[in-house]
Amino acid sequence: MLVHLFRVGIRGGPVPRWSLQSLRFQTFSAARSSDDQFSSCLLRAVAQLRSQLRAHLPRSPPASHRSTSAWCWVGGTLVVPAVLWQHPRFCLIALCEAKGSPPAQPTRARELRFKWKLFWHFLHPHLLALGLAIVLALGAALVNVQIPLLLGQLVEIVAKYTREHVGSFVSESRRLSIQLLLLYGVQGLLTFGYLVLLSHMGERMAMDMRKALFSSLLRQDIAFFDAKKTGQLVSRLTTDVQEFKSSFKLVISQGLRSSTQVIGSLMTLSILSPRLTLMLAVVTPALMGVGTLMGSGLRKLSRQCQEQIARATGVADEALGSVRTVRAFAMEKREEERYQAELESCCCKAEELGRGIALFQGLSNIAFNCMVLGTLFIGGSLVAGQQLKGGDLMSFLVASQTVQRSMASLSVLFGQVVRGLSAGARVFEYMSLSPVIPLTGGYSIPSKDLRGSITFQNVSFSYPCRPGFNVLKNFTLKLPPGKIVALVGQSGGGKTTVASLLERFYDPTAGVVTLDGHDLRTLDPSWLRGQVIGFISQEPVLFATTIMENIRFGKLDASDEEVYTAARKANAHEFISSFPDGYSTVVGERGTTLSGGQKQRLAIARALIKRPTVLILDEATSALDAESERIVQEALDRASAGRTVLVIAHRLSTVRAAHSIIVMANGQVCEAGTHEELLQKGGLYAELIRRQALDASLPSAPPAEKPEDHRSCQ
């Protein structure tokens, strides 16, 4: 086709009165080959490419009725490949539009913005302390501005005494010396005052921000935690808040003071020598402009550095939190390498940021020193011409040094402020998030009317982190009040998802889940989880506190007697009493000092203490040995009496007594019935029973192959 296009161009292009459409048809027809589909797509892409080029190139005047012969085609043949080489997106857009599909847009990282309204919310309670700190800082700055004037007068006395040798130097300089000492003392007191106030205010603000951020994180949807790493969240609670607090304190303690000193010293300089001050006025705006340009790049680097720190923290948190798994697989070296890789990347980002800040400060110091040198040169010329006193030049030099130090401090502060604003934006990002599923609000069914009847009606669901994959598909299930319903099936079939929807960790994408005829979305989630549903998982999580507090976690206002009763029902009272500290025994992080069966019984007691109407057992005994399973199963049987129970089981021997057994596969109900009914059907459930029995009789046999889903899912 390209050869044909070049040939047509050499011939001179379209003749008069030929439409562009006819030329395109002629050219496209000549380009047809045996690969008709490829040629058609490519030709349409060329047509769209021409439109894209027209849209991006400047408009030209309407062409005459005669085309510009071969030169247009030759030029196009030479230019278009170069354009495509430099701008391949033209070709991508043309090809996608030729196929009828939109081009993929490049994903851009969303830039975080500092939320001043939220910042004001935390600053408002401390306005009085802030105002007083600002007054003290301004006072200290104004005192600093007065010091160069007194030093200049003192230098004049020294020069006069050196020239004339008249009078007493001590008597003439006593007054100025006392004034300077008083100013130094006042400056120290003012500095002490505003630093104490800023420290108090900064720590209080940081505490309030951490409380608000932690509260916001706890209120987020479970889907939020599916997509975020714990280490990154902890990093925002600690590192980012600390960075922001430090920056805020520096802005007041150094930024405000340095800015005031710069302004006051410049006013003093303009009074001492307008000519020298004019030189500074010309140079200073140029320096500020350069600093502003460099600041945007430093902010971006700072944000990337903090994000990398959060990733490194996430790796460390994951490894340390799962240290037993790491040790069991001898993967210490691999985790070290993972963490080292993240640290290397973090170090590179931090070094790049440090080089940027160092470049900024280095250029600032060079510029300021050149300003001092220029001041000495021009000021010396003025003194030689008797247009300026020596003492005034000394005052000017000291004041200009004050300006230099203050602006150097501002340059250092600039990098800190950049990091602080970026850290604050990251903190406020999560603080301003609103969960899709609120923690509170909605209808609470009176206890006298609560029966525990649960219905899943045509429910479909996909996890927010995997929106294109349906875990449940038109799933329908009814849990009668006071009955035990068991969900069995292969892993990944959607059993645990059913429990998550029942606890309203997520909302279904289609269909409805009801409790006693009420849509769960209309009920108070806090009431539903706190009083109606008790949840016991395969891996119970205990907190690093006493056994008493872990059981009371299910009902904070429970009395000691209620805790003892719940422990007895869970078959836990006996082993708890055998500990030297009894119920005051600290279980360690995640209950590491207890066995699996002991942790499971504490989890049962924690669920029973709130007297739930509905009980969810998510493979509660699958990770236990035979003896522990027997003890725990006794407790579960006792806990299930009179309650609506949803059992998720892998060991089918534990669900034989269920009133109804639901066999799930691929997010759908394949079979339903009692144990005997399902065995008589000879379907998927019977196959699972047969394979588990075979595995039990052959303990050394390899894992059985998974049965095919289509056996009973017609």
Curated annotation (Swiss-Prot):
Strong expression is found in the heart, brain and testis. In the testis, expressed both in the somatic Sertoli cells and peritubular cells and in the germline (spermatogonia and pachytene spermatocytes). Also expressed in the lung, liver, intestine and kidney. Residues 132-419 form the ABC transmembrane type-1 domain. The keyword Membrane applies. The mitochondrial potassium channel (mitoK(ATP)) is composed of 4 subunits of CCDC51/MITOK and 4 subunits of ABCB8/MITOSUR. Physically interacts with PAAT. Interacts with Neuropilin-1 (NRP1) in mitochondria. Residues 454-691 form the ABC transporter domain. ATP-binding subunit of the mitochondrial ATP-gated potassium channel (mitoK(ATP)). v. An increase in ATP intracellular levels closes the channel, inhibiting K(+) transport, whereas a decrease in ATP levels enhances K(+) uptake in the mitochondrial matrix. Plays a role in mitochondrial iron transport. Required for maintenance of normal cardiac function, possibly by influencing mitochondrial iron export and regulating the maturation of cytosolic iron sulfur cluster-containing enzymes. The chain crosses the membrane at residues 127-147, 178-198, 278-298, 365-385. Its main location: mitochondrion. It is found in: Mitochondrion inner membrane. This is Mitochondrial potassium channel ATP-binding subunit. ATP binds at residues 489-496. It comes from the Eukaryota. One of its GO terms (molecular function) is ATP binding. Belongs to the ABC transporter superfamily. ABCB family. Multidrug resistance exporter (TC 3.A.1.201) subfamily. One of its GO terms (cellular component) is mitochondrion. Residues 1-25 form a transit peptide. Keywords: ATP-binding, Ion transport, Membrane, Mitochondrion, Mitochondrion inner membrane, Nucleotide-binding, Potassium, Potassium transport, Transit peptide, Transmembrane, Transmembrane helix, Transport. SMART domains: AAA. GO terms for biological process: cell volume homeostasis; mitochondrial potassium ion transmembrane transport; potassium ion transmembrane transport; transmembrane transport. It is a multi-pass membrane protein.
